[in-house]
């Protein structure tokens, strides 16, 4: 496929996210797709396979924390670059969580396209927001008093 065709596929992917059309999203993925999710959160890591990426990571780990009727993963998006079999996009989206938080996330995604399907995706996003809004982790660290604040070790 050409860079223009790969770009068009990712544009369809973002439009499907705008409309919460998860069946269309599922069909756009290669059976052996790999998701590379930044960070050390419960949605981070390297995820293998269409079912694990689409139903497991998106369906179980994300959608179960959000109010499905109100979530819009792609409220705005833009393709930044398309060259060869790679496409880079920026996306903003989110909505209310079941715990009452607002999950408004910004993503940078790098797609690799193979045989007209998404073969691999690297996703970069605010992992602190994921922890706080989706997994109720305040990430607070107890204050440690300094013995001598002017001492340098």
Residue ranges of model-derived segments:
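Hydrophobic pocket/interface hotspot
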Residues: 10-13, 25-26, 33, 53, ...
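Short, aromatic-enriched amphipathic alpha-helices that serve as compact interaction elements
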Residues: 3-21, 28
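A solvent-exposed, acidic/Ser-Thr-rich amphipathic alpha-helical stretch
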Residues: 30-86
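A beta-strand edge to alpha-helix "cap/lid" segment located at domain peripheries
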Residues: 2-5, 61-153
């Amino acid at each position: 496929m050409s860079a223009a065709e790969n770009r068009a596929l990712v544009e369809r992917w973002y439009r499907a996210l705008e409309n919460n059309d998860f069946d269309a999203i599922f069909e756009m993925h290669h059976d052996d797709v790999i998701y590379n999710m930044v960070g050390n959160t419960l949605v981070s890591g390297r995820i293998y396979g269409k079912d694990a990426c689409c139903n497991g990571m998106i369906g179980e780990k994300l959608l179960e924390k959000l109010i499905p009727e109100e979530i819009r993963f792609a409220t705005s998006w833009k393709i930044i670059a398309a060259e060869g079999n790679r496409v880079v996009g920026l996306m903003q989206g989110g909505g209310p969580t079941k715990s009452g938080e607002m999950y408004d996330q910004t993503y940078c995604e790098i797609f690799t396209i193979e045989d007209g399907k998404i073969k691999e995706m690297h996703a970069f996003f605010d992992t602190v927001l994921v922890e706080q809004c989706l997994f109720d982790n305040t990430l607070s660290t107890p204050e440690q008093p300094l013995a001598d604040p002017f001492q340098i070790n």
